[in-house]
Amino acid sequence: MLSKFLTMEYLVHPGTLSLAAGVACGMCLGWGLRSHLGMFPQNSTSEANRDTETGTEASILGESGEYKMILVVRTDLKMGKGKVAAQCSHAAVSAYKQTQRRSPQVLKEWEYCGQPKVVVKAPDEDTLIQLLTHAKTLGLTVSLIQDAGRTQIEPGSRTVLGIGPGPVELIDEVTGHLKLY
């Protein structure tokens, strides 16, 4: 009990309080001046290396700052609503994981935009493959889902193509002509 009393007495000692107030004021003043004068710490070397590794990717990040993910569903397979939902979920999760690994900054931007996802129709597998090829040439993340074939459709059927997340301008260049599902 005596040690608690002595500790409390030391903490409320005028000299201790003055020291604490001085340190707090100094930190606030330093922080305020740093932000006012624009003196921010430089990027770490790992961040700088990552930026140079992704060079073109960083330069094509959406000019408007908008990002989205597109899920392209084949309509010729006549999948039920639940099947389409499951296949789209597989594509979205796969695309998310790829982007998290390859382009974490793109993923952050997409999340900041509200994680928009749009589902569109493709008439057949050939269209899906053409879209995949075009998206890859633009450097977009792609995720082609093949069904296991345990329920409604043949094993190995390519059901959904996930594109993105990525800059709206690039994704629209690939899928802008497709109709909503």
From Swiss-Prot:
Disulfide bonds: none annotated. InterPro entries: Pep_tRNA_hydro_II_dom_sf, PTH2. One of its GO terms (molecular function) is peptidyl-tRNA hydrolase activity. The chain crosses the membrane at residues 10-32. Keywords: Hydrolase, Isopeptide bond, Membrane, Mitochondrion, Mitochondrion outer membrane, Transmembrane, Transmembrane helix, Ubl conjugation. It is found in: Mitochondrion outer membrane. One of its GO terms (biological process) is negative regulation of anoikis. It comes from the Eukaryota. It catalyses: an N-acyl-L-alpha-aminoacyl-tRNA + H2O = an N-acyl-L-amino acid + a tRNA + H(+). The keyword Transport does not apply. Pfam families: PTH2. Ubiquitinated by PRKN during mitophagy, leading to its degradation and enhancement of mitophagy. Deubiquitinated by USP30. The keyword Cell inner membrane does not apply. One of its GO terms (cellular component) is mitochondrion. Its EC number is 3.1.1.29. It is a single-pass membrane protein. There is a cross-link at residues 78, 83, 97, 108, 117, 179 (Glycyl lysine isopeptide (Lys-Gly) (interchain with G-Cter in ubiquitin)). Monomer. Peptidyl-tRNA hydrolase which releases tRNAs from the ribosome during protein synthesis. Promotes caspase-independent apoptosis by regulating the function of two transcriptional regulators, AES and TLE1. Belongs to the PTH2 family. This is Peptidyl-tRNA hydrolase 2, mitochondrial. It comes from Mus musculus (Mouse). The gene is Ptrh2.
